[in-house]
């Protein structure tokens, strides 16, 4: 399904860009305050989670449905978990996400950004 392909690429790129570039800059919190809003975090987490589940069920151009889009699915799932953590922190609620995942937010952001670029360039490749 092509719409889920583009949704996966867009959400992985947005999550990767936010986690790697914007979180390292302190002035981005003042320039783009909506990026740190609870509603934005929840919407991006839900879209990323939906795209990850749909990519696992419906791969693009692969013969093995479970293994077809493994890397974008993993990137979308971890991005969903990280932004659910941001949502819980913004609402001052305890987060169900493990600290080890949150500690590696920047490398996971790089993984998500790389997954979106590679998935955009090499869509029919198996395991990507």
Swiss-Prot record:
State where it is primarily located. Answer: membrane
Q: Name one GO cellular component term.
A: plasma membrane
Q: How does it sit in the membrane?
A: Multi-pass membrane protein
Keyword field contains Membrane: yes
Q: Which residues cross the membrane?
A: 2-22, 34-54, 64-84, 108-128
- Superkingdom of origin organism: Bacteria
Which UniProt key words apply to this protein?
A: Cell membrane, Membrane, Transmembrane, Transmembrane helix
Write the protein's name: Uncharacterized protein TP_0070
Q: What is the lineage of its organism?
A: Bacteria, Pseudomonadati, Spirochaetota, Spirochaetia, Spirochaetales
